[in-house]
Amino acid sequence: MSAEAEEDCHSDADRVGDEGNESPAERDLQAQLQMFRAQWMFELTPGVGSSHGETRPCRAGRSSMLKAAADTKGRQELAKEEKARELFLQAVEEEQNGALYEAIKFYRRAMQLVPDIEFKITYTRSPDGDGVGSGYIEENEDASKMADLLSYFQQQLTLQESVLKLCQPELETSQTHISVLPMEVLMYIFRWVVSSDLDLRSLEQLSLVCRGFYICARDPEIWRLACLKVWGRSCMKLVPYASWREMFLERPRVRFDGVYISKTTYIRQGEQSLDGFYRAWHQVEYYRYMRFFPDGHVMMLTTPEEPPSIVPRLRTRNTRTDAILLGHYRLSQDADNQTKVFAVITKKKEEKPLDHKYRYFRRVPVQEADHSFHVGLQLCSSGHQRFNKLIWIHHSCHITYKATGETAVSAFEIDKMYTPLLFARVRSYTAFSERPL
């Protein structure tokens, strides 16, 4: 087959030489036909054509086509890389100016064009055109700045304004804007936001408004007062925490913006029936509620009523629920690095009015006694929430007789009836503030 192809190519060449008086269009057509035949024969027998039967015009046409395709692909790759380089350097400049969201957009577009564009850039020159990215420093100064967002925002406010303003009005208004207030007044407002209930969650949400509010919300004095209110004298030293805010967030503590709830269910046998084939069984359910306050007070209630009807009554200590137990608690951290909560609670005392008018009765001595309950709980975390679980470790009843001063202690066995208490946040508990921090 290769011999036939060579004979066809020679015959075509002789025919072109004999017919020298043909028009240029016909000569181009014959040349294209000759190239097509040679390429077709080369595709049918690639091994033979590459070694013996491939003619010089066939090799020249194929090499020119491959070279043109390679040049086109190379130009496209260079253009794509140059565009990615410009986008990346523009993102660097936006990041230096503080426009982080715009920088992220340019970074994303550059990475979509060339994934490893970061390693192909030389930072000694700026791209051709508008000169974006000039003055870029390869050191990690900007990275360290962004790691400490507080100092970064403080520096930005100092560079932008000759007179320090924490915020600026977004729209023009005839009313007085909050940016006019001095720093001392703003900090006092922030202390009202935290309030005596230690609503640090609202403070964190307030810090998202602007850079100035972020700086105010990170004020060390606010977080120091919050730590002192929770742990008292036991938190005088900041070590091993880096800041008061880190201590408040990381150190184990009970939560105040909700209530700890547990549900206990068991089945007991009912009364005997006259019918021997029927036995009554009852499913009993009851709840335990524990509410902690920052000033050291605690409330505990055991009732069969469900949370929707009980939780609103536990907002303050001045509740009218008769079965409520009131007391104080303290936090204790053992050598095994486990935090425990110990509380002493008593039933709310009720003064009964005595009516002695027109009554005569014999005085009978009644032995008065005070009842108190001692509770021990282990504080731990579960799931994605922190410090949201209390596990029973101790429960006892102490009866003190006033006449003799003796105290009788009855300890309860901690079994499966003492289910762990899980925390549930209640928004109404921090809906308004009564006193500042």
UniProtKB/Swiss-Prot annotation:
The modification Phosphoserine is found at S126. GO terms for cellular component: cytoplasm; SCF ubiquitin ligase complex. Residues 1-26 are annotated as: Disordered. Keywords: Acetylation, Cytoplasm, Phosphoprotein, TPR repeat, Ubl conjugation pathway. It comes from the Eukaryota. PROSITE patterns: FBOX. Pfam families: F-box-like, FBO_C. Substrate recognition component of a SCF (SKP1-CUL1-F-box protein) E3 ubiquitin-protein ligase complex which mediates the ubiquitination and subsequent proteasomal degradation of target proteins and plays a role in several biological processes such as cell cycle, cell proliferation, or maintenance of chromosome stability. Ubiquitinates mTORC1-bound TTI1 and TELO2 when they are phosphorylated by CK2 following growth factor deprivation, leading to their degradation. In contrast, does not mediate ubiquitination of TTI1 and TELO2 when they are part of the mTORC2 complex. This is F-box only protein 9.
